[in-house]
A protein has these predicted regions:
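Structured C-terminal cap/extension of enzyme domains
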Residues: 183-238, 243, 250-255
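Alpha-amylase-like alpha-glycosidases and glucanotransferases acting on alpha-linked glucans and related
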Residues: 1-175, 179-186, 192-207
Length: 255
């Protein structure tokens, strides 16, 4: 705060040079964070400290042009965190997998979304959607199949139904992991929190995405109005050019 949050301004400025949007992890930590004395081997002597709150975000919004932020607001949130999120105007996260957790009244169900949020089928910390479905049992499995109208269909069809559920929601932004588009199981999971081992080792290879998959990815994006403006304009031009070519061909045939 003494230097106008210089480190944060530099970091976020650089991030916006690299990415379209930046997700701020553990958003609640900017309201309150648990501080443990350096060198302690346990958290017993830790205590809650106040974070910078909106003072930091006002500074970032003022210093960085076109700053786009996603606030990771998952888990337990205090009233003051919710107030900070609302004041910031940043969209929070909605994870579809969290919607089917034994309750049929979850705030993660799409019909409860408002526009200012980002929907994910799952994140890097979740199972892939296929892996999650394969491990789901009992009431939760029944409810998710009912919700997406996918009763007896193969699991890959259910994965695509969940992708459509996310894309068709009112959320301003939808994020679909490539593992879900490819209908990969948990062998392609990115990270299992609080574990050691093969985390962050999965890689996408060039031959994993077929032209058919690319077509389906683009089509569901188009159908639900989520194509980038440039792509929409290009598609409109291509359609117009095709129609003009057909008209010229018809004129030639008539003559």
């Amino acid at each position: 705060k003494k230097d106008g949050y210089g480190w944060w301004v530099q970091r976020m400025t650089h991030c916006m040079e690299l990415y379209d949007v930046v997700r701020i992890d553990h958003f609640r930590g900017f309201d309150e964070y648990y501080a443990i004395p350096y060198g302690d081997k346990t958290a017993e002597r830790g205590k809650w400290e106040k974070g910078p709150g909106m003072d930091l975000f006002h500074t970032l919004d003022k210093k960085i042009k076109d700053l786009r932020v996603i606030a990771e607001d998952l888990g337990f949130l205090t009233e003051s965190v919710l107030e900070m999120l609302k004041e910031s105007g940043y969209p929070g996260m909605k994870v579809l997998q969290f919607a089917f957790d034994g309750s049929e009244d979850s705030s993660y169900l799409p019909y409860k979304y408002d526009h200012n949020c980002v929907v994910y089928t799952g994140t890097h910390d979740n199972e892939t959607t296929k892996g999650w479905l394969e491990n789901l049992q009992g009431h939760d499995l029944k409810f998710v199949r009912e919700y997406i109208n996918c009763y007896e269909q193969p699991v890959n069809d259910c994965v695509w139904a969940l992708i459509r559920t996310a894309l068709s929601s009112v959320a301003d932004l939808a994020v679909i992991p490539i593992q879900d588009y490819l209908c990969l199981g948990n062998e392609a999971r990115m990270n299992a929190p609080s574990t050691f081992g093969d985390n962050w080792k999965w890689r996408l290879t060039a031959n994993q995405i077929s032209e058919t998959t690319l077509y389906h990815m683009r089509e569901v994006t188009r159908i639900y109005g989520r194509l980038a403006k440039a792509s929409e304009e290009k598609e409109t031009d291509e359609i117009a050019n095709t129609e003009e070519e057909e008209r010229q061909d018809n004129d030639q045939n008539l003559s």
